[in-house]
Amino acid sequence: MTLSTEMSDASGLAEETDIDVVGEGEDEEDEEEEDDDEGGGGGPRLAVPAQRRRRRRSYAGEDELEDLEEEEDDDDILLAPPAGGSPAPPGPAPAAGAGAGGGGGGGGAGGGGSAGSGAKNPLVKPPYSYIALITMAILQSPKKRLTLSEICEFISGRFPYYREKFPAWQNSIRHNLSLNDCFVKIPREPGNPGKGNYWTLDPESADMFDNGSFLRRRKRFKRQPLLPPNAAAAESLLLRGAGAAGGAGDPAAAAALFPPAPPPPPHAYGYGPYGCGYGLQLPPYAPPSALFAAAAAAAAAAAFHPHSPPPPPPPHGAAAELARTAFGYRPHPLGAALPGPLPASAAKAGGPGASALARSPFSIESIIGGSLGPAAAAAAAAQAAAAAQASPSPSPVAAPPAPGSSGGGCAAQAAVGPAAALTRSLVAAAAAAASSVSSSAALGTLHQGTALSSVENFTARISNC
């Protein structure tokens, strides 16, 4: 009895161990099931519970899922410890541990995948503004000037964030170049082919960043307009009256109005004004000559005091001298041979100088003729009358002829007819000019009393004929 019971228990354990290994002999079990169906069972078989009996495999997806779920439920039931507290068989335990370890490994793999996905996106935007990026690009170039495409190329090569998002920020770089005064556009040279202008930094924007750090900008740079230096001194000089100083052509007054520009102060920052030899090389400020000092003073005085009288103009000689010295003018060697202006005394006296000037073919009156107006015509007529009076002519006051010799007197007067006609025409022209123009406009050379007396004498002589 005991031997049979022990053998039965051993056979039961063997059955359990064979059943616990699921999926190990699926092909063998399928073949056994087919043999059972065909032959109706040949030899003795181990008793298998009804729940463990495998059904014919169907090729539908739902049937396969149901079979797998039933097998997993059966495995859980077999692996569960009995109610009496007997220890579980040692076989399935390693499989369960391996499954748990595999699950842990899968979790670790999942965690590693999440960490890898987090480290896969390191694109962080740099903490620099577009102005700082452009400044970096320009400063690293050898000539301290770059085009828009070269600036974008530098930024893309230096920062991966902008390399990945390249087309989006190119317009921002363009707008910052155009709208900020710290960047100056330089056109291309005629012999330098290419597209786009160059951009450089304004020399006065060196202190734009704090201590050379591009993380923070100290202030917004604004380009100052070109104003005359020392404006306060110029205004005070204008208020005191700069007309006399400008009229005298004093170089000291001109230097006070327009002093030379002072040299730039030494830079106190450590990184220097962006290095040396970059940007626009502006020419030094040159003060204007003293010739323009009076004009500038008059314009500024009129702007400050619109109701005040203008300052007196500079003398003719001083202005001419200033013009010659300011513009490097030197008199031509033939200039001494040209006739100079007629002195006022000679014009009033009506001497030979005036007549020679009137008869000169190079004078303005001889070239233009009578188009200078009535004053010039009156002056020319007066000069001609003075020349006629200086020449020998019969006395205007003649003794009255005897009654018996009236015919002889008329014949004598008829002999001098052409000369008298010329004199009468000249005197008539002088009288007409004197009636239309005042004696001051005729330069004081024509006296109305003399003209009237001459007309009366000629009228009396004509009536005697």
UniProtKB/Swiss-Prot annotation:
A GO CC term attached to the entry: nucleus
DNA-binding region: 124-215
Bias kind Acidic residues: ranges: 15-39, 61-77
Main location: nucleus
Keyword line: DNA-binding, Nucleus, Transcription, Transcription regulation
Pfam families referenced in this protein's UniProt entry, alphabetically: Forkhead
Cellular compartment(s): Nucleus
Gene Ontology molecular function terms on file: DNA binding; DNA binding, bending; DNA-binding transcription activator activity, RNA polymerase II-specific; DNA-binding transcription factor activity; DNA-binding transcription factor activity, RNA polymerase II-specific; RNA polymerase II cis-regulatory region sequence-specific DNA binding; sequence-specific DNA binding
Biased composition (Pro residues): 393-403
Biased composition annotated in UniProt, kind: Gly residues: 98-116
Domain of life per record: Eukaryota
Stretches the record annotates as Disordered: 1-117, 391-410
UniProt-listed CDD domains: FH_FOXD1_D2-like
Disulfide bonds: none
Keyword Nucleus: yes
InterPro entries listed in its UniProt record: Fork_head_dom, FOX_domain-containing, TF_fork_head_CS_1, TF_fork_head_CS_2, WH-like_DNA-bd_sf, WH_DNA-bd_sf
Gene Ontology BP annotations: anatomical structure morphogenesis; axon guidance; canonical Wnt signaling pathway; cell differentiation; dichotomous subdivision of terminal units involved in ureteric bud branching; luteinizing hormone secretion; metanephric capsule development; metanephric capsule specification
Keyword presence, Cell inner membrane: no
Known role: Transcription factor involved in regulation of gene expression in a variety of processes, including formation of positional identity in the developing retina, regionalization of the optic chiasm, morphogenesis of the kidney, and neuralization of ectodermal cells. Involved in transcriptional activation of PGF and C3 genes.
PANTHER family, per database record: FORKHEAD BOX PROTEIN, FORKHEAD BOX PROTEIN D1
Protein's recorded name: Forkhead box protein D1
Organism: Homo sapiens (Human)
